[in-house]
Amino acid sequence: MHGHGGYDSDFSDDEQGGGSSKKRKKTVEDELLLTKPFQKEKYGKVAHKQVAADLLDREEARNRRFHLIAMDAYQRHTKFVNDYILYYGGKREDFKRLGENDKTDLDVIRENHRFLWNEEDEADMTWEKRLAKKYYDKLFKEYCIADLSRYKENKFGFRWRIEKEVISGKGQFFCGNKCCDEKEGLKSWEVNFGYTEHGEKRNALVKLRLCQECSFKLNFHHRRKEIKSTKKRSKTKTESDESPHKNSRSSSSEEASQGKDEGHSSSKRSEDSRNRNAGEEDSASDSELWKGPLPETDEKSQEEEFDDYFQDLFL
């Protein structure tokens, strides 16, 4: 018995239960209609362990990627090596590079350098030869720098000048011996330089500028060819060679000038005679004007002109 006037109903609970179920259906339908196609499902419960592990792995991978990007190549290499040793074992000496066969650019140039490059040398060009050829092209090959330390053994060393030596004047305005900086009394010498390079014997004519003491060292065994300035001699020779030509040119020019003078004089004479004739004619005409009045001329009338014209036609 319930306390509402002593009345009770068996259908009251069923009606209340039916209304709540309808409300639930409406809410589910509304949620289905309002959900977007790209919207993720809502977890009303605690996430599964696998889902949580995947999220953690993804976050860790993102952090590791940012960490590796911040490193340079050497730091990444050391990190990977340390990780390999930590996870798989091994010794650190196994990862050390052997530097016995390492070569710098200077070593490559020393191995492949040539005092003079020929067309045959440029046939098969490797990257080492190209590097040596590039260095050779930057050298200045007018004067040489000499090593005269073993002049008593008749052994000399020659090399081309570099840009720094060209700017400072070493080898041209200063002595070409690498251990001498004398700049007075320099002489130019031409040396037939014989050398062996890459198993081949070659010769090259080399110019040197040396002081007196270094010239004595160069010519210790036999005298080399000295290069003297031939500008004055060449000038005197050219002047002597050109003198007969100059004389002939001067004589021909005099004859031409004489001919031109004669031509000018004759032309002047003709012009003078013409001017005289014109002046005489003008003076005659002026004198005739002042002699008296002009004679009267009878002008024919138009009829008389017609009569004369027709008379000539009918004759």
Swiss-Prot record:
May be involved in pre-mRNA splicing. One of its GO terms (biological process) is mRNA splicing, via spliceosome. Residues 225-235 have a biased composition (Basic residues). This is Protein FRA10AC1 homolog. Residues 1-28, 225-308 are annotated as: Disordered. Residues 236-245, 257-279 have a biased composition (Basic and acidic residues). The modification Phosphoserine is found at residues 9, 12, 251-252, 283, 285. Keywords: Acetylation, Nucleus, Phosphoprotein. Interacts with ESS2. It comes from Rattus norvegicus. Pfam families: Fra10Ac1 (PF09725). The gene is Fra10ac1. Transmembrane segments: none annotated. It is found in: Nucleus. Its main location: nucleus. PANTHER family: ACID PHOSPHATASE-RELATED (PTHR11567), PROTEIN FRA10AC1 (PTHR11567:SF25). One of its GO terms (molecular function) is phosphatase activity.
